[in-house]
Amino acid sequence: MDNEDQESLLLQGVPDNYGGVKVNLTEPMTIEDFVPKLRASLVYWSNQGTKGIWLKLADGLDNLIAPAKAEGFVCHHAEREYTMLTSWIADVPSTLPANASHRIGVGAFVLNKKTKEVLVVQEIDGHFKGTGVWKLPTGVVKEGENIWEGALREVEEETGIKTKFVEVLAFRESHQAFLEIKTDIFFLCELEPTTFEIKKQDSEILAAKWMPIEEYVNQPWNQKKELFRFMANICLKRLQEMEYMGFSKVLTTTSSGKESYLYCNTDHANLLNATRGLASTSG
């Protein structure tokens, strides 16, 4: 059997950088056609010393999930466009990474420095429904969205206020938070308003207003709940003592050339931005 005939009996895969193979199936396939090819492919990959198999089934190929599981595959994750299954066929412990373990949230401390007021909202639904608590605008960062972009978007969506990113003031990590499974990382961002007229989001926001920061900090909820008291205190300290510095963003690129943001001490971020393009020096 020549190579062309052999390839016709196998699922076509692309090697990854870790001794594995990625298979991306997009065209309809019957179970009768799929199972023999999968079995032959597993034998072939094993003989080649392959370790892990990533089997990506496009939406509409759900008929292949159960047969793949019967051959040792397990579900890794699913999106609207596909289902990803994996199989580890090497005789060493699996090193395949788990499904995404974290969710990224943002909260926006939008401060009007002239009036010393902070932008706050009351939500229609959620944890604070019916409590009367005024809270900072919050939300979840979307896939492919930067932390600072998510904060700006959430504020504009919820209140109509346009802002500029200033700093990440702090962040919080909480395990088994989202769906009682995923870890939630929450970034508290300071934003500078560039508009001030509130136009609340009717679908999610019950009310929105500018509140004196002391009034926000001294709400019974913020005083009773330690985490909220700590974050409110950070916001107050930022207003009272501008020496409190968080992390500013520095646009850079990864080794593959993709844009990426580095967050670091504001003073050093300003230095890095000011010296961009210059030869690096020690110290």
Curated annotation (Swiss-Prot):
This is Nudix hydrolase 6. A motif (Nudix box) lies at residues 139-160. Its cofactor is Mg(2+); Mn(2+). Expressed in stems and leaves. Weakly or not expressed in roots. GO terms for biological process: positive regulation of salicylic acid mediated signaling pathway; response to other organism. It catalyses: ADP-D-ribose + H2O = D-ribose 5-phosphate + AMP + 2 H(+); NAD(+) + H2O = beta-nicotinamide D-ribonucleotide + AMP + 2 H(+); NADH + H2O = reduced beta-nicotinamide D-ribonucleotide + AMP + 2 H(+). Residues 101-233 form the Nudix hydrolase domain. GO terms for cellular component: cytosol. CDD domains: NUDIX_ASFGF2_Nudt6 (cd04670). Pfam families: NUDIX, Nudix_hydro. Keywords: Hydrolase, Magnesium, Manganese, Metal-binding, NAD. GO terms for molecular function: ADP-ribose diphosphatase activity; metal ion binding; NAD binding; NAD+ diphosphatase activity; NADH pyrophosphatase activity. Its EC number is 3.6.1.-, 3.6.1.13, 3.6.1.22. The gene is NUDT6. It comes from Arabidopsis thaliana. Probably mediates the hydrolysis of some nucleoside diphosphate derivatives. In vitro, it can use both NADH and ADP-ribose as substrates; however the relevance of such substrates in vivo is unclear.
